[in-house]
Curated annotation (Swiss-Prot):
SUPFAM superfamilies to which the protein is assigned, alphabetical: Acetyl-CoA synthetase-like
InterPro entries, per database record: AMP-bd_C, AMP-bd_C_sf, AMP-binding_CS, AMP-dep_synth/lig_dom
Name the record gives this protein: Putative acyl-CoA synthetase YngI
GO MF term set: ATP binding; medium-chain fatty acid-CoA ligase activity
Length: 549
C-alpha cells in the first residue's frame, strides 16, 4: 500500500513532468493536439500566470462551462497552481441551472466555450448578465452576481465584456516565474481546490468542497487498484466536469504519468475509433456508454486488442454488461468503482487481480487508507457481515463539506467523521461490497421492502432486454408498486405481459413489476446518471396515478 501524498495538484503535475518529460500527456487525435508532460505543465503554468494577471486570486471561485476540450484541462491545473477553486459546470445546463450555480457558488470568474449540442453559451450568459455589453473585460459589475468580475470566452471571435482565451497567453508574459512560485508556495494540501455540484438526480445540486489532499490521494489509490502505469494510454469519454472525468480519469493518469486521450463529446464510434487509432490500453465509462459501444453495428470492425483495463462506474453496473466488456472488448483487468462526489469520489473498487466473479458481482473493497462499514439505516449500529444496511465511509477522501450549507453537511457527516452515503449495501467476510440500492429508491409494497436493483438484475437476463430501470410508484391498495422501464435490443420484441410471465415463479410475486414501459432513452444527467425521479414522474403521469396515494 502506497503512502498518502502530502502535496498539491500543481506540484503533482510538476513532479510527473520532471519524471516523464517526453511522454504523451494529452492527445486529441481529431484536433491534432499532442502535448508531452513537459509541454503540458508549461501550458498550465502559462494559463496560471494569465489568470493571475486577470485578477484571479487565491480562494476565488472559477467556474468552467465547457466539454472535454484541452482548455478545460489547462484550467484544471492552472487554477490548482494559483489556489483558485475550480467550479465545474454541467455541459447540459440551461439558463435556469447556470443562474443557480453562479449565485450559489459565488463565482468570481466564468470560462465558457461557444456552444454544446446546439446550446449557445454566450447567448445564455448575455441573457443573464446584460451588463456585459458595457463592461470592460475583468471589470464586470453585475447586480445579479455581485462576486462575478471576469469572463473568458473560448471561441473564434471576441465578445463584449469578456477576455478571449488567447489573452491568457498574452497576459502570462507580464507575470514572472517568481510570482507564480510565491503563489504556489502559499498553498496548503488542505485548501479547497474544487467544487463539484451533485448531479441533481434528487433535487437542487449542492456544492461539494474537495481539497488537494482529497482528490490527489483518491486518484492515486484508484490508479493503484487498476495497476495503472506510465506505459498506459487512457481514453476518457466521461465528462471532465464530473469526478469520473477529472479524478478517475485525468488525475489518475497524472499520478503515474499515463497518457490522456479525451473524447470531446461521447459518441460510441468516436470512442471505438480513438481506442483503435491511439492504441489505448484503458477505457472508462458508465454502463450506458459501454452498452452503446458493444451494441454498435460496426463494433466488430474496430481493433480493440490493446485494451487491458478501465473503470465502469457512475451507476449500478449490470453483471451481464461487465461480462460482455471482459469477453468482447478484451478488458480482462477492468475494475468497478463505487462512490459519490462527497467522497472525492471513489469509496470501494475492485482490483485488477481480483477474481472474475468478484469483479463482475461486487463493487470491490475499501480503497487503501479508508474505512467502510455497513450500518442499520438511521443509526450508527454496524450490522453483521452479509446483512444489508447503509454504507458509511471515513478517511482522507471525505469532503470538507457542502458550500454554504452547514445543515446538509451535518446530516451527511457525523461527529466521528463518518460520511453517510444513502446507499444500501451488503459486505461479505472479506470486505467486498455489493450495492443493493438507494435508501430513497427502496419501495414498500404491502409492507414488503423491494429493492429495484434486484428486479433490474433479474430482468437483464431476458434475451430481449438491453437495459432496465425500476422505480416505485404510488398504489392505492399496496402503497407502492414497481414500474419497469425497458430498453429492448435491436430487432427484439416482447410484450409487457410476456415479461411479467417471464418473472412468474422466478422472483417473488410482490416483486413482479405492475407496470412495464418500453423506451428508447432514459432521462440522464450529463455525467451519465439516470434520473429515476423523472421516470417515476412520467409513470405517474402516464397511468394517471396520484403521487399522494
Amino acid at each position: 500500500m502506497a503512502e498518502l501524498i502530502h502535496s498539491t495538484i500543481g506540484r503533482l503535475l510538476e513532479q510527473t513532468a520532471d519524471a516523464y518529460p517526453d511522454r504523451d500527456a494529452v492527445v486529441y487525435p481529431d484536433r491534432n493536439i499532442r502535448y508531452t508532460y513537459a509541454q503540458f505543465d508549461s501550458l498550465c503554468r502559462q494559463t496560471a500566470k494569465g489568470l493571475m494577471r486577470m485578477g484571479i486570486g487565491k480562494g476565488d471561485h472559477v467556474a468552467i462551462w465547457a466539454s472535454n476540450i484541452s482548455e478545460w484541462l489547462a484550467v484544471q491545473f492552472a487554477t490548482a497552481k494559483i489556489g483558485a477553486v475550480l467550479v465545474t459546470v454541467n455541459t447540459n445546463y440551461q439558463a435556469h441551472e447556470l443562474d443557480y450555480l453562479l449565485k450559489q457558488s459565488d463565482a468570481a470568474a466564468l470560462i465558457i466555450m461557444d456552444s454544446y449540442r446546439g446550446t449557445s453559451y454566450p447567448d445564455i450568459v448575455n441573457s443573464l448578465i446584460p451588463e456585459l455589453q458595457e463592461a470592460k473585460p475583468g471589470q464586470l459589475k453585475s447586480e445579479r452576481y455581485p462576486f462575478l468580475k471576469t469572463l473568458i470566452y473560448i471561441g473564434n471571435k471576441r465578445l463584449s465584456g469578456m477576455y478571449h482565451w488567447d489573452d491568457t497567453e498574452i497576459l502570462a508574459k507580464t507575470v514572472t516565474d517568481a510570482e507564480l512560485e510565491e503563489r504556489m508556495n502559499s498553498l496548503d494540501k488542505d485548501n479547497v481546490i474544487n467544487m463539484q455540484y451533485t448531479s441533481g438526480t434528487t433535487g437542487f445540486p449542492k456544492g461539494v468542497m474537495l481539497t488537494h489532499f482529497n482528490v490527489i490521494n483518491n486518484a492515486a489509490n484508484i490508479a493503484e487498484c487498476m495497476a495503472l502505469t506510465s506505459q498506459d494510454r487512457m481514453c476518457i469519454p466521461v465528462p471532465f466536469f464530473h469526478c469520473f472525468g477529472c479524478v478517475l480519469g485525468v488525475l489518475a493518469c497524472v499520478s503515474v504519468g499515463a497518457a490522456m486521450i479525451p473524447v470531446q463529446e461521447f459518441d460510441p464510434v468516436t470512442v471505438l475509433k480513438t481506442v483503435e487509432k491511439e492504441k489505448c490500453t484503458v477505457l472508462h465509462g458508465v454502463p450506458t456508454m459501454f452498452i452503446a459501444e458493444l451494441h454498435h453495428p460496426d463494433f466488430d470492425a474496430y481493433d480493440l486488442s490493446t485494451l487491458r483495463t478501465g473503470i465502469m462506474a457512475g451507476s449500478p453496473c449490470p453483471s451481464e454488461v461487465m461480462k460482455a466488456v471482459i469477453e468482447r472488448m478484451g478488458m480482462k483487468d477492468i475494475t468497478i468503482a463505487y462512490g459519490q462526489t462527497e467522497a472525492s469520489p471513489v469509496i470501494t473498487q475492485t482490483r485488477a487481480n481480483d477474481s472474475f466473479i468478484r469483479r463482475v458481482e461486487t463493487t470491490g473493497r475499501a480503497l487503501p487508507h479508508t474505512e467502510v462499514k455497513i450500518v442499520e439505516p438511521g443509526t450508527c449500529q454496524e450490522v453483521q457481515r452479509g446483512m444489508q444496511g447503509e454504507l458509511c465511509t471515513r478517511g482522507y477522501h471525505v469532503m470538507k463539506g457542502y458550500y454554504k450549507d452547514k445543515d446538509a453537511t451535518r446530516k451527511a457527516i457525523n461527529h466521528d467523521g463518518w460520511l453517510f452515503t444513502g446507499d444500501l449495501a451488503v459486505m461479505d467476510e472479506d470486505g467486498y461490497c455489493r450495492i443493493t440500492g438507494r435508501l430513497k429508491d427502496m419501495l414498500i409494497r404491502g409492507g414488503e421492502n423491494i429493492y429495484p436493483r434486484e428486479i433490474e438484475e433479474f430482468l437483464y437476463q431476458h434475451p430481449a432486454v438491453l437495459d432496465v430501470q425500476v422505480v416505485g410508484v404510488p398504489d392505492a391498495k399496496f402503497g407502492e408498486e414497481a414500474a419497469a422501464w425497458i430498453k429492448l435490443k435491436d430487432g427484439k420484441s416482447v410484450s409487457p405481459d410476456e415479461l411479467k410471465a417471464y418473472c412468474k415463479g422466478k422472483i417473488a410475486r410482490h416483486k413482479i413489476p405492475r407496470y412495464v414501459i418500453f423506451t428508447d432513452d432514459y432521462p440522464m444527467t450529463a455525467s451519465g446518471k439516470i434520473q429515476k425521479y423523472k421516470l417515476r414522474e412520467k409513470t405517474i403521469e402516464m397511468f394517471n396515478l396520484s403521487s399522494s396515494q
